[in-house]
Amino acid sequence: VSVRCIEPDNAAYPTALKQYRYSTVLPTLKAIAHPAALGLSQLPKLALFGSSQCEPELVTASVNLAQQLQEVGVCTIGGFHTPVEKACWTALMAGTQPMLYCPARSIDTLKLTQAQQTAIAQQRLMILSPFPPSQKRMTAALAGKRNQLVAALAEALLILHAKPGSKTEALVKTAIAWGKPCWTIPHPSHGHLLQLGVRSLPTLPNSTLLF
């Protein structure tokens, strides 16, 4: 599978990045996807974000919700890097619904797992990155930029967990300012998110209501 370059003037370039500007310069995107699946980036997408430190009961609730998302076919997007995000990734990859994976590094030399290769061949997985070949290793700075990209690309956000004053909370504020729906799992530690305007998601509604 080859790495494709998607310039801002390309018809396959996500229109959301032109509307929700997190950078003064529109990034050139690199994509790994089946040739017939380049349109995955234009689907309505739910972004998943979860802090590195997440209580066990929240991880369980997040995985249960991820299983529901894959069962109803919601297209998800994220970096899937923190433990709770990785747990959701495993649940989501077990389905057949579309997914977008955005690592916080260049994908020019990215080694794909067998599961990723299979999902790409099935035209359900696209891997996207705005980073040049020189940025081969993930850093905190790149992760921050990646998260901004994911939030800009998504139609709605699902906050699995975010601590007060965290970078994830700051991202939520940006998304709400953009007018994007933000959801979170009901939990006593999420009161600050509800005060920001994040909505509680006790059960998965009709998937169209997420957006």
What are these regions (language model features)?
Residues 3-211:
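Glycine-biased, small-residue-rich flexible motifs in mid-sequence functional cores and linkers
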